[in-house]
């Protein structure tokens, strides 16, 4: 740290207690004024703040008496159940591009429309001249989300129509970012790995004829090689992370910032800043850290009682990170099940067999079975507890040889589609800035 940074650090350390004292608001005041903290009710359900035609999450159904009854989770993209969309993919078909078209434009493409869309994306996987050298490689960062965000904001200076209004211009900008996000992520990682870890660096150009999943693996690996199963599993992971309603933190951020009238690059950079937060986009990393801890402390992975005993210690805060949590279990919205996890699980099993890691898959199965029981023993829960998609996604990425630094960027490569769809919907349907109210509880000083 520089002298000025040391000075600031010392000053900040002296001021933190007074900051905490004067910025703490009692929970009783939230109850007194009927304010739902974090825009969630006491059961964790999000407060209704808008309408969307892009997706829907179903976790409860209305009973005969009008009460909410927990049900198996459902995720809908533009009126289609995601389970149906994925089941209807033809043998040999990658689905990311087709479902991206659906989310962006509101209807499934015809054969010719899909071919045109795929070609446009493929031919748009290019960066400005010397951008990789001058921007990505000049300031490598271990935090690839920071690297990508910097690149996104810098790209705005290369766009002569950066602030031009109009749906067509915003579609152009969104599609450009969808196309190049894999490049920003992979190239950012290679630059970091070379300059910080002294590893060999290779920059592979994407193949415009390949899918997003294939290009990601091709650009990441030194030999450009991947199996069809690897690419299909990654394609499914991307599909299941593309969109998850308007209320998730990064998508809501996109809509809030878009409502201010800012440009596409700034709106997506804001969404990236939200997603990089460990409470949002880093869940699968915590699962992987937890699983490594379990593998190192549980001697017999097939012994359900031994696994159960260790998970109880975890819930009691005695082991791992001492926070009393089993990561990858439960969800802010879903109750009985996460539909993404149920779809993804079959792909994970196939990959684990191909990678000869089915013994680890069995450990995941055991945890999936016993963890909800242990959580129910230790906690008062308002709804069911089941594994979410993050429970398996990190395991998949590890089996694919994807470094942990790219786990959250992969989330972004998928979610940029949902962000773009919500940005376009916000531009089309809204002409007022989003401006919620805050109740002041400060004491006036004479």
What are these regions (language model features)?
Residues 1-446:
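Non-transmembrane, aqueous-exposed alpha-helical and coiled segments at domain scale
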């Amino acid at each position: 740290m520089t002298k000025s940074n040391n000075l600031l650090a010392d000053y900040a350390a002296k001021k933190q207690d007074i900051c905490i004292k004067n910025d703490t608001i009692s929970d009783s005041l939230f109850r007194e004024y009927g304010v739902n903290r974090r825009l969630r009710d006491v059961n964790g359900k999000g407060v209704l703040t808008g309408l969307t035609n892009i997706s829907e999450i179903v976790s409860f159904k209305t009973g005969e008496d009008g009460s909410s009854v927990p049900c198996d989770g459902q995720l809908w993209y533009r009126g289609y159940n995601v389970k149906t969309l994925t089941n209807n993919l033809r043998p040999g078909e990658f689905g990311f591009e087709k479902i991206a078209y659906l989310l962006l434009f509101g209807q499934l493409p015809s054969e010719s429309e899909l071919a045109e869309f795929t070609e446009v994306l493929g031919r748009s996987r290019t960066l400005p001249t010397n951008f990789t050298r001058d921007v990505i490689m000049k300031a490598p960062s271990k935090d690839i989300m920071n690297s990508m965000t910097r690149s996104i904001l810098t790209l705005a200076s290369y766009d002569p129509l950066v602030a031009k209004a109009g749906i067509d211009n915003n579609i152009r900008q969104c599609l450009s970012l969808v196309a190049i996000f894999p490049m920003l992520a992979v190239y950012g990682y290679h630059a970091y790995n070379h300059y910080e870890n002294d590893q060999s660096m290779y920059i592979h150009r994407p193949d415009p004829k390949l899918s997003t999943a294939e290009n990601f693996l091709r650009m990441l690996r030194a030999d450009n090689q991947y199996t069809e199963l690897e690419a299909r599993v990654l394609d499914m992971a991307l599909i299941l992370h593309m969109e998850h309603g308007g209320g998730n933190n990064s998508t809501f951020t996109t809509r809030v910032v878009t409502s201010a009238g800012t440009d596409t690059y700034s709106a997506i950079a804001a969404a990236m800043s939200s997603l990089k937060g460990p409470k949002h986009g880093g869940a699968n990393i915590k699962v992987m850290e937890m699983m490594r801890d379990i593998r190192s402390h549980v001697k017999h992975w097939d012994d359900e009682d031994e696994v159960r005993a260790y998970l109880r210690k975890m819930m009691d805060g005695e082991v791992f990170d001492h926070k009393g949590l089993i990561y990858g279990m439960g969800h802010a919205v879903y109750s009985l099940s996460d539909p993404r996890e149920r779809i993804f699980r079959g792909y994970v099993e196939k990959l684990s067999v191909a990678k000869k890691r089915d013994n680890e898959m069995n450990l995941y199965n055991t945890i999936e079975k016993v963890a909800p029981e242990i959580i129910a023993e230790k906690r008062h829960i308002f709804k069911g507890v089941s594994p979410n998609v993050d429970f398996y996604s990190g395991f998949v990425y590890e089996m694919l040889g994807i470094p942990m630094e790219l786990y959250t960027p992969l989330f972004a490569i998928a979610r940029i589609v949902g962000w773009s769809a919500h940005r376009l919907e916000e531009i089309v349907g809204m002409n007022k800035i989003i401006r919620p109210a805050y109740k002041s509880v400060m004491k006036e000083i004479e």
